[in-house]
């Protein structure tokens, strides 16, 4: 009996070994060094945070930074055949999780050892973890992978370039189906994890603040795309790969939940910036109660064009040029990976018993980017790009406390310190002597026009050094010079 048990255990151990024998692994990735100087120290490593206003003395002294945290590695796994499809997997990690408290989504004070320590021990993070079934014209994907909005980036030196203007950066757990037809057309759809939207900080929006307010709405994020690609007159390089004329449209939607907010009459006061107290589930002489759910619906539509201007019909890229452009419109666009949305809106809707009721509204934005690239030869090429994003549909009327609150519908209570217009310009000279080595030297300019004018802060008590309108500002800018080196493996 003991012999049969031993044989059974050995056979059980052999089953996964036999399955693994049909699997092939390949290692890929790159080692990257970034060296940069910024005139405005409020921007993140990836230029995904707004530059501070030019009258902010704390952030306009410059910053010099060297980092290798953009390095990454990945495994491509070729698995067995199943249902007539080839099964493959992809797992990728990098070290770009936390930089210095200024990276989008990373709170100040949580930067850890990497910021202040002598040994820059950045924490690894998961980028992609997915597997897929590939048939000749179809693909079914499961796992964490790129959003459909993230397929066309400008080729600049920073990671996730133009996150504030041209292309969002988002990777979400998803189920995606892709179908090719008629040779040149591709359609795809996904359902995935909904993302957080940025509600005003003075309001407790979700029922459980520790839970993503997209997940609280219990609806997935959905995306769909249509792509047309055809070699009409030749190809040009996109990240070094010969690519034909391509046109693409992507759309996305999700739902987020919050509570309709009511505010205490005796705490809001004459505050135009929206820092009054929020009253929830409280009844008193000066407080109200409103228990209705409110749903907000982030959505975005993006159109992309890749145009070979000076094409090639071979792998020789010398003398080739392209134009790439993305243009988009939406609301709550941070749910799809755009940065620099500091808050969404609360608008005064009505009043009851002289109490003030406010309703959340998502910030509406549009924007885009355009890139031109030219290859002098197969080693040297030049890249120039411009991106812009703009908030629209924002009333500048602010609700002030008064004897009566009737007739003031749609005036805003608070919208955070949002930028009305963001612009980015980058010029990058690239040198790639061999496929494994790539160097870049870049100048980039970023500028933000804010809705609000702010006086400069100074002193321990935060008193402006000269409290007059001459010192106020609604504009911030950053000049960056960056060198980058890659070793691909």
Give the predicted meaning of each segment.
Residues 8-16:
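Bacterial N-terminal signal peptides
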Residues 62-68, 121-123, 167-169, 214-219, ...:
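Short sequence motifs at beta-strands and strand-loop junctions characteristic
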Residues 77-83, 134-137, 181-183, 230-232, ...:
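Outer-membrane beta-barrel strand-turn architecture
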Residues 224, 238-423, 427:
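Detector for outer-membrane/organellar transmembrane beta-barrel domains
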């Amino acid at each position: 009996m003991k012999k049969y048990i031993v044989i059974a255990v050995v056979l059980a151990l052999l089953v996964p070994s036999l399955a693994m024998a049909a699997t092939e692994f390949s290692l890929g990735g790159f080692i990257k060094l970034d060296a940069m100087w910024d005139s405005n120290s409020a921007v993140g490593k990836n230029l995904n945070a707004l530059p501070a206003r030019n009258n902010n003395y704390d952030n306009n002294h410059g910053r010099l930074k060297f980092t290798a945290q953009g390095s990454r590695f990945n495994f491509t796994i070729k698995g067995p055949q199943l249902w007539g499809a080839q099964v493959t997997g992809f797992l990728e990690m990098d070290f770009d999780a936390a930089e210095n408290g200024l990276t989008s989504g990373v709170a100040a004070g949580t930067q850890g050892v990497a910021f202040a320590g002598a040994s820059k021990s950045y924490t690894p993070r998961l980028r992609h973890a997915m597997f897929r079934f590939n048939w000749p014209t179809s693909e079914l994907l499961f796992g964490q992978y790129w959003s459909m909005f993230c397929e066309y980036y400008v080729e600049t030196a920073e990671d996730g370039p133009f996150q504030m203007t041209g292309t969002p950066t988002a990777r979400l757990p998803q189920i995606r189906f892709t179908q090719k037809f008629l040779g040149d057309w591709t359609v795809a759809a996904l359902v995935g994890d909904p993302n957080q939207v940025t509600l005003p900080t003075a309001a407790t929006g979700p029922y459980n603040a520790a839970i993503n307010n997209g997940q609280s709405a219990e609806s997935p994020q959905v995306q769909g795309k249509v792509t047309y690609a055809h070699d009409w007159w030749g190809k040009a390089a996109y990240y070094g790969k010969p690519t034909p004329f391509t046109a693409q449209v992507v759309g996305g939607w999700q739902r987020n939940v919050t509570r309709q907010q009511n505010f205490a009459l005796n705490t809001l006061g004459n505050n135009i910036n929206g820092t009054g107290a929020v009253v929830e589930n409280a009844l008193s002489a000066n407080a109200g109660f409103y228990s209705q759910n409110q749903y907000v619906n982030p959505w975005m539509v993006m159109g992309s064009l890749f145009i070979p201007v000076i094409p090639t019909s071979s792998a020789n890229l010398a003398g080739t040029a392209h134009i790439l452009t993305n243009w988009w419109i939406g609301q709550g666009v941070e749910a799809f990976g755009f940065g620099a949305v500091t808050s969404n809106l609360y608008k005064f809707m009505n009043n009851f018993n002289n109490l003030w009721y406010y309703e959340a509204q998502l910030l509406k934005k549009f924007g885009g980017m355009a890139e031109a690239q030219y290859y002098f030869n197969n080693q040297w090429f030049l890249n120039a790009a411009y991106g812009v994003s703009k908030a629209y549909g924002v009333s500048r009327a602010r609700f002030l406390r008064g004897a009566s609150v009737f007739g003031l519908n749609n005036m805003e209570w608070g919208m955070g310190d949002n930028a009305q217009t963001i612009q980015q310009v980058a010029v990058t000279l690239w040198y790639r002597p061999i496929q494994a080595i790539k160097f870049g030297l870049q100048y980039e300019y970023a500028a933000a026009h804010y809705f609000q004018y702010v006086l400069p802060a100074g002193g321990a008590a935060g008193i402006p050094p000269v409290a007059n309108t001459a010192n106020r500002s609604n504009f911030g800018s950053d000049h960056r010079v960056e060198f980058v080196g890659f070793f691909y493996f």
